[in-house]
């Protein structure tokens, strides 16, 4: 969030797309080593790099190497798995905070003055929409993330179920995990299905798959304006926009449907940035709101599809019977369960601190009907 901080030159706006606290102050330095910048960071002082851009990237890499050295403590899963998860997230947050203390000054109209700096205009337009008329400070690590996201957006993500690509800008969750899309493409549809809702559409990929499967009238909803714009562009690009009406609303439209699909965030924890709201759902708020509200929006004999993994159970963040209790409370009956194993890199990375849970993870599609 924007916040004005003092520097050794003048007060200036500090921007950070996470929920981290702004530094107390910042100092402009031509060049410095990783040790000096980290020392400043521990004192809540940001370092603004005014020298060569490529040198700044090298120093940032050195900072990452320093703070991500393996712990001296015995490796392996904690006896308290839930504690291990929260400790992992805390460590990630602390490391991110330190890395974000190396910043650059963004000149008006999204420009950089640093030597050998790239053109960042398009990448920052994806994030902020309106170009700046005054300079501001931005963590270098975040800037590099914005540039990477912009390149991914241009390239697009191949979606085999669509025989096409989905393009996702910064601020919208990217469907890099394809296993749940297979479930949506394979789950049986009722004969003569006419209407469907995609709740929390994000990039629009689920709505697109439903349209590709022949459902003629789909409403896709989201509360994120960036997601609405993203989904709209993707469906137009895929030639599926005539079948899908995209609405900026929370959860359900006022009408009813034959099929209602939701892929809520899978982990009940607090997000630390806007993009993490697609990953973390405090107290399973969206999950329970969907289940408790979906019944009254289903047409007679209609189905609700819930896509969710059991990672939260393996991390001891959710009881194994939690979902069944939610289904009972919402007067929903499970008529079928489809499942698959994740294929993404973290699922098979034994060096991942949460590998002990990820290698047990299964992704499910629950087909639900009103009792």
Report each predicted region and the residues it spans.
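Conserved beta-strand signature within the Rossmann-like core of class I S-adenosyl-L-methionine
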Residues: 301-309
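Conserved SAM/SAH cofactor-binding pocket of Class I
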Residues: 177-264, 268-272
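Glycine-rich S-adenosyl-L-methionine
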Residues: 275-299
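N-terminal auxiliary segments of SAM/dcSAM-dependent transferases
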Residues: 2-33, 37-157
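SAM-dependent Rossmann-like transferase core, predominantly class I methyltransferases
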Residues: 119-195, 199-209, 358-360
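Short "lid" loop at the C-terminus of a central beta-strand within the Rossmann-like core
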Residues: 266-267, 284, 309-314
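Short, electropositive alpha-helical surface patch
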Residues: 312-330
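Class I S-adenosyl-L-methionine
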Residues: 324-371
